[in-house]
């Protein structure tokens, strides 16, 4: 996407198909390929997955988490956070881990990112740093900032089938499946 105009410069969806198939009519095999059964509807080649699938944003959401943390004052621009990977999500009442698989940074143990500022954490895409910022914010403030930044809205791109964003909140906090899928940076009690 062109950051100045919002114009789409490139887009891909896989599996793909050859649009020339439609010139002389589709064979039964091509129809079957394009219109997979309902249980595989999300992966049908006829669907533009780049704009229609609702997927966890992954590391791109770290910018939202960091911005929200700075705006709410829970992290300073020059403050460092030590990567003590892995990041365990804990029940605030019991202190027990509520996730069997703690969030790990992409670096391999024993390597870690050590003390980092937000700029270094973005550069290194450090999961631990943004888990800690998300924890300091709380899930509802993080969700509010995601909404303020327009992540719950359609982009109004001139292509049909665009899905609207979905943002979780406190009610999703202890559904660990939703929590992991929501931001890939869960909060810790």
Where are the regions that the model predicts?
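Beta-lactam-recognizing serine transpeptidase/beta-lactamase-like catalytic domain environment
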Residues: 4-59, 64-189
């Amino acid at each position: 996407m062109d950051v100045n105009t919002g114009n789409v410069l490139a887009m891909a969806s896989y599996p793909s198909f050859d649009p020339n198939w439609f010139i002389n009519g589709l064979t039964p095999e091509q129809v079957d390929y394009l219109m997979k059964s309902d249980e595989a509807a999300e992966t049908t080649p006829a669907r533009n997955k780049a704009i229609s699938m609702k997927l966890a944003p992954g590391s791109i959401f770290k910018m939202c988490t960091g911005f929200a943390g700075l705006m709410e004052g829970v992290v300073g621009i020059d403050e460092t956070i030590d990567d003590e990977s892995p990041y365990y999500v804990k029940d605030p009442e019991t202190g027990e881990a509520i996730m069997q698989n703690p969030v790990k940074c992409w670096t391999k143990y024993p390597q870690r990112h050590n003390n980092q500022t937000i700029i270094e954490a973005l550069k290194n895409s450090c999961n631990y740093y943004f888990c800690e910022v998300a924890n300091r914010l709380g899930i509802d403030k993080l969700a509010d900032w995601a909404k303020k930044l327009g992540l719950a809205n359609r982009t109004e791109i001139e292509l049909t089938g665009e899905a609207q964003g979905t943002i979780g909140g406190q009610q999703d906090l202890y559904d660990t499946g939703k929590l992991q899928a929501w931001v890939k940076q869960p909060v810790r009690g």
